[in-house]
């Protein structure tokens, strides 16, 4: 199975539905899958008949984050991170790769000039947050749990570090300090999600909301989204995201130094194993 088969694209009466369909791996993300997701986002953005975009996943969990096996199950065998023939990496290799493969995707999805809605069920871990946080609205099933446990790897948080904006400073710190989870109800109280619904109503509720939004004038929707996003940027959102991305890479640099230039994925896994936090 190639990576493109993990992403589905459908249109339902002016609503594009992008589905990550890899339930057997808890919708873990590889380089190929992220590229295919980005292609789907671009397709929806460029379709004049689409007014609203919905992001969903299949199975019990929204996403387990990055695929930490280090191998992309696509036909060309693309790896999760950058590679050099000698097996050694420089800090800038990983910085450039994550800029293109993670940060720029999240930024582009956030700024697509159409309303976007994420439907989240089960666990949403680490890079899973980078799928739902760029969306304008989030509908969570009552069993949803949000976490970013990458502190266990010596990293201060995922690449798109929107924690403070999504949860507020104290709840963001608790999530990062403890590697614990934020429940759907806690996320609702923090303003991170818009609605919490029973799991069996997640799809229908999200699509009803999307079709309701699609009834609004598309130019008004575009300007309303731009106004809110621009207000956040004026308050420092984009600058903070850039600064935190740099801090994120200080963690990777530390891992590279500690392991003599091994790939960061392997260095991070070794760190977790040494701490007894993974098998």
Region spans (language model):
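Glycine- (often His-adjacent) and acidic-residue-rich active-site loop
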Residues: 25, 57-104, 152
């Amino acid at each position: 199975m190639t990576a493109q088969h993990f992403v589905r694209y459908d249109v339902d009466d002016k609503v594009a539905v992008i589905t990550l369909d890899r339930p057997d791996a808890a919708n873990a993300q590889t380089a190929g899958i992220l590229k295919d997701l980005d292609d789907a986002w671009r397709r929806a953005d460029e379709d004049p008949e689409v007014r609203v975009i919905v992001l969903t996943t299949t199975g019990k969990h929204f996403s387990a984050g990055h695929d930490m096996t280090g191998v992309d199950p696509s036909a060309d065998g693309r790896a999760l991170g950058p590679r050099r023939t000698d097996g050694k990496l420089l800090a800038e290799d990983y910085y450039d790769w994550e800029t293109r493969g993670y940060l720029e995707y999240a930024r582009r999805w956030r700024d697509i000039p159409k309303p976007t809605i994420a439907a989240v069920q089960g666990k949403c871990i680490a890079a899973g947050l980078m799928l739902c946080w760029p969306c304008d609205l989030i509908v969570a099933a009552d069993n949803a749990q949000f976490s970013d446990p990458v502190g266990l790897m010596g990293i201060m948080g995922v690449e798109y570090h929107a924690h403070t904006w999504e949860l507020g400073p104290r709840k963001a710190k608790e999530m990062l300090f403890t590697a614990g989870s934020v429940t759907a109800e806690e996320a609702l109280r923090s303003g991170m999600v818009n609605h919490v619904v029973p799991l069996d109503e997640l799809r229908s509720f999200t699509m009803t909301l999307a079709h309701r939004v699609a009834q609004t004038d598309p130019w008004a929707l575009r300007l309303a989204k731009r106004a809110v996003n621009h207000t956040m940027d004026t308050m420092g959102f984009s600058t903070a995201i850039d600064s935190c991305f740099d801090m994120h890479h200080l963690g990777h640099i530390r891992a590279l130094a500690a392991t003599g230039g091994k790939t960061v994925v392997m260095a991070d896994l070794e760190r977790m194993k040494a701490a007894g936090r993974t098998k």
